[in-house]
């Protein structure tokens, strides 16, 4: 099926800014320096309701409301993938790699996790539009019922002038608007609910910038500081919005990841900042210019994987070293690889393995504790990073113990067993894949792999030119990925 996405700029949809009702929750207090307004929610028509995380406890579980009436019950979870291409988004079955649906959507679009196991957030020219991947589970007593439906781009859009990073952590989803500095944090389970924003935590940074925010389980918030011209550091706010700690020794802030124990790592042009235990620690890079702008974290590991660039004058560096930041002692080590990589090359395995997709076509598996490359799995032909960060290049996405790798040159996608060291399934595509993301079909939960799924190069749309944080882990700036 081929759906046409509603126009997020439709004059009939007049987004209204709302703030969280007073007293609804203490954690929704705004930043001390600026009272923020809730991110506008655009409802073009009858909005699709999001999948609830709780099912009815009657004789039979009721499927969650869907944007389509074509709902089928399945025997098990049906994880799905989404890939962007020039002209739309294709949704695939993550097990068979077959195309489930093709959704038309013009423009350069980015895929972000929503955090509820069913939806994705598509960064468009109008904001963050909710994509229903059409797979979910409904708890029912001591078991669950599983459902599938046709994927659809819903009419729910969180309006943003320049949609930037999306960070999912501990059942909460944080959206950052680079054009205004507005931050909206809401329960992941309500992202697709047009009323979910009513209880959202909202705030605005003192100045608009390509930024990021991470909310932790106690309601504290790590938020970047900067302007359109320069990003300098981060602040740690408590649940009431009061400053607990701050550090302005992080030039070019970009990218974030959460490690075991809720330690947050923020990338800088000369190392990283580690936010843990209510304190912010600077970890210097071994080079005067050692940019880490894309990271991938895992709740299974205290070590965060990051990129590493050391040539401030390079237009396109093509790095061959990655960084491993140990949040236990705030230390940093570099690992040499046999090939370069890009901002879409970083991922984490279920056991915390550090995964890097190289331009040699292999998926390199690194032990984060020893820094040793334990295996390299050939996946695609050798390739070269394109000059423009928006151009398609092989991308890595890890879900449910499987590493998925796209091959734009071959118009294909591969599922890789990174533990067994083999490609177990491949499929041809009828489009040139660009971005890659997915959903498990499981309801929103706390914990899990953390990465800024909005890796970019630092430079554009959330990118800082030439440094790109792949929202990769997160370089949401042009290619400084």
Positions of predicted regions on the chain:
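Long, acidic/polar, low-complexity amphipathic helices and coiled-coil-like
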Residues: 145-267
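Blade-level signature of beta-propeller repeat domains, shared across WD40, Kelch, NHL, RCC1
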Residues: 408-457, 480-481
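A short beta-strand motif characteristic of beta-propeller blades
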Residues: 95-103, 140-158, 194-205, 241-248, ...
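C-terminal motif of bacterial Sec signal peptides marking the signal peptidase cleavage site
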Residues: 43-46
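Bacterial signal peptide processing site
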Residues: 48-51
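Acidic, serine/threonine- and glycine-rich low-complexity intrinsically disordered segments
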Residues: 225-349
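Repeated scaffold domains used in trafficking and secretory/extracellular systems
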Residues: 67-72, 105-119, 151-171, 202-218, ...
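Short beta-strand elements that form the blades of beta-propeller/WD-repeat-like
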Residues: 73-85, 112, 117-130, 164-185, ...
């Amino acid at each position: 099926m081929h759906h046409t996405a509603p126009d997020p700029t439709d004059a009939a949809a007049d987004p209204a800014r709302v703030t969280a009702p007073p007293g609804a929750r203490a954690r929704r207090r705004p930043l001390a320096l600026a009272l923020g307004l809730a991110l506008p929610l655009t409802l073009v028509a009858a909005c699709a309701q999001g999948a609830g995380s709780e099912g009815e406890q009657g004789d039979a579980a009721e499927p969650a409301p869907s944007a389509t009436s074509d709902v089928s019950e399945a025997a098990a979870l049906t994880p799905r993938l989404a890939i962007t291409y020039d002209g739309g988004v294709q949704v695939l079955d993550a097990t068979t790699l077959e195309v489930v649906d093709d959704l038309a959507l013009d423009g350069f679009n980015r895929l972000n996790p929503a955090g509820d196991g069913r939806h994705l957030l598509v960064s468009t020219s109008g904001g963050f539009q909710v994509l229903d991947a059409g797979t979910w589970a409904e708890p029912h007593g001591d078991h669950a019922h599983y459902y599938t439906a046709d994927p659809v781009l819903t009419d729910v859009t969180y309006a943003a002038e320049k949609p930037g990073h999306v960070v999912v952590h501990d059942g909460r989803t944080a959206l950052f608007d680079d054009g205004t500095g507005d931050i909206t944090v809401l329960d992941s389970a309500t992202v697709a609910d047009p009323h979910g924003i009513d209880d959202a935590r909202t705030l605005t940074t003192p100045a608009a910038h390509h930024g990021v925010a991470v909310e932790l389980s106690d309601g504290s918030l790590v938020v970047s500081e900067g302007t359109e011209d320069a990003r300098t550091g981060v602040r740690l706010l408590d649940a009431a919005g009061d400053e607990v700690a701050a550090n302005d020794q992080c030039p070019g802030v970009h990218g974030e990841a959460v490690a075991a124990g809720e330690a947050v790592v923020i990338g800088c042009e000369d190392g990283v900042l580690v936010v843990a235990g209510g304190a912010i620690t600077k970890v210097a890079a071994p080079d005067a210019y050692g940019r880490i702008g894309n990271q991938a974290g895992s709740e299974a590991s205290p070590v965060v994987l990051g990129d590493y660039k050391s040539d401030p004058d390079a237009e396109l560096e093509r790095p061959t070293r990655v960084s491993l930041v140990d949040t236990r002692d705030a230390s940093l080590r570099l690992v040499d690889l046999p090939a370069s990589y890009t901002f879409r090359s970083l991922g984490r395995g279920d056991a915390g393995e550090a995964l890097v997709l190289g331009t040699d076509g292999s998926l390199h598996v690194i032990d984060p504790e020893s820094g040793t490359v334990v295996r390299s799995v050939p996946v695609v032909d050798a390739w070269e990073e394109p000059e423009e960060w928006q151009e398609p290049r092989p991308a890595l996405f890890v879900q449910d113990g499987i590493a998925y790798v796209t091959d734009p040159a071959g118009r294909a996608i591969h599922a890789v067993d990174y533990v067994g060291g083999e490609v177990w399934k491949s499929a041809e595509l009828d489009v040139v894949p660009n971005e890659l993301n997915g959903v498990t079909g499981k309801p929103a939960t706390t914990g899990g792999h953390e990465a800024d799924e909005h890796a970019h190069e630092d430079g554009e749309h959330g990118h800082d030119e030439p440094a790109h944080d792949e929202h990769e882990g997160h370089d949401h700036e042009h290619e400084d990925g």
